């Protein structure tokens, strides 16, 4: 059994989400073949050298799971793209490139955070290209921590304001981009997060059936995708009783 999650937006101000995530680590993930975290794991990440005590506690919890034998893979999101090798090494996790094709129970599956699929959001795509430029990343990582904190707060504030003003179809994936990317990587299954619109979409690519699975964000409830011999099963769970509502739970 393999678990995939995304968009937890972990922060100290949401202990309910943190408790639910730790419950996931201590129960379902403990016996999993792998745990994939597909971006926006943290609400903000200003660099591995700027870890708070809260973030260090999450790192330690991941390390405990990794040491128990469950491989952990972390992908950058638009909120935590400064997560680096130091954090992953401390957490016992592997940093996964976006996009990546992985084998899940014998099937090649394309994993993405999902923001790069939202090509109609021209302003965001332009900002994304700037922030992901290697030179810009180098500069960001070497700015004083205080400056990075201010910049992160400014970017989050502007992002929320702009998202509220944009039409729903603008901030969702571009329909034509999905089959193009899937054909490019030669897969029939795509899993991503980012849009906060959990669903399993059936597609037709050429003469082949395909599917796009959108992971949910953790806010009023949590979401996880379980992949096993039975296939792909997307399910939500309640924070009040954070045992996953997944088959076999």
From Swiss-Prot:
Entry note: cofactor: Binds 2 Mn(2+) ions per subunit in a binuclear metal center.
Pfam families with a match to the protein in the record: Metallophos (PF00149)
Reported cofactor(s): Mn(2+)
Residues where substrate binds: 78-79, 121, 159, 163, 166, 194
Coiled-coil residue windows: none
EC code(s) of this entry: 3.6.1.54
Subcellular locations according to the entry: Cell inner membrane
Chain sites annotated for binding Mn(2+) 2: 40, 78, 113, 194
Keywords: Cell inner membrane, Cell membrane, Hydrolase, Lipid A biosynthesis, Lipid biosynthesis, Lipid metabolism, Manganese, Membrane, Metal-binding
Membrane topology, record value: Peripheral membrane protein
GO cellular component: cytoplasm; extrinsic component of plasma membrane
TM helices/strands, residue ranges: none
Residues reported to bind Mn(2+) 1: 7, 9, 40, 196
Stated family: Belongs to the LpxH family.
Protein name (database record): UDP-2,3-diacylglucosamine hydrolase
Organism: Pseudomonas fluorescens (strain SBW25)
């Amino acid at each position: 059994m393999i678990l995939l999650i995304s968009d937890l937006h972990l922060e100290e101000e949401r202990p309910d989400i943190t408790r639910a995530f730790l419950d996931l680590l201590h129960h379902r993930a403990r016996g999993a073949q792998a745990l994939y975290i597909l971006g926006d794991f943290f609400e903000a990440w200003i660099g591995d050298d700027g870890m708070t005590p809260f973030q260090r506690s999450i790192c330690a919890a991941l390390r405990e799971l990794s040491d128990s034998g469950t491989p952990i893979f972390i992908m950058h999101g638009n909120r935590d793209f400064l997560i680096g090798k130091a954090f992953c090494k401390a957490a016992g996790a592997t940093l996964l490139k976006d996009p990546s094709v992985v084998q899940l129970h014998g099937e090649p599956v394309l994993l993405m955070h999902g923001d790069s699929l939202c090509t109609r959001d021209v302003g965001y795509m332009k900002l994304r290209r700037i922030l992901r430029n290697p030179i810009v990343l180098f500069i960001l990582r070497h700015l004083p921590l205080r400056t990075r904190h201010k910049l992160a707060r400014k970017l989050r504030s502007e992002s929320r304001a702009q998202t509220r003003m944009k039409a729903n179809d603008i901030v969702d994936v571009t329909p034509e981009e999905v089959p193009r990317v899937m054909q490019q990587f030669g897969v029939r299954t795509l899993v991503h997060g980012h849009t906060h619109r959990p669903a399993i979409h059936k597609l037709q690519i050429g003469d082949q059936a395909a599917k796009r699975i959108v992971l949910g964000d953790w806010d009023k409830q949590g979401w996880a995708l379980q992949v096993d011999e039975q296939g792909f099963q997307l399910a939500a769970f309640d924070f009040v009783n954070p045992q996953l509502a997944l088959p076999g739970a």
